[in-house]
Amino acid sequence: MTKRTLGGTSRKRKRVSGFRVRMRTHTGRRVIRARRKKGRSQLAV
């Protein structure tokens, strides 16, 4: 059996889909708005 080597990095995750990154663009703000409307406890990473 081979090991799962792709662990994921928190810095990259934040840079790609963090709250401040979302707020930068119009579509990102739309994502946040949609998640607020749906009642998500976590809006972004």
Curated annotation (Swiss-Prot):
Biased composition (Basic residues) is annotated at 10-27
Q: Do you know which NCBIfam families this protein is assigned to?
A: rpmH_bact (TIGR01030)
Q: What are the boundaries of the signal sequence?
A: none
Q: Does the keyword Ribosomal protein apply?
A: yes
The family this protein is said to belong to = Belongs to the bacterial ribosomal protein bL34 family.
PROSITE patterns for the chain: RIBOSOMAL_L34 (PS00784)
Q: Which Gene3D superfamilies match?
A: 1.10.287.3980
In terms of InterPro entries, this protein maps to: Ribosomal_bL34 (IPR000271), Ribosomal_bL34_CS (IPR020939)
Keywords on record: Ribonucleoprotein, Ribosomal protein
User: What GO CC terms are in its UniProt record?
Assistant: ribonucleoprotein complex; ribosome
What protein name applies here? Large ribosomal subunit protein bL34
> What segment(s) does the record annotate as region Disordered?
1-27
Provide the GO biological process annotations: translation
Any one Gene Ontology MF annotation carried by this entry is: structural constituent of ribosome
Q: Does the keyword Ribonucleoprotein apply?
A: yes
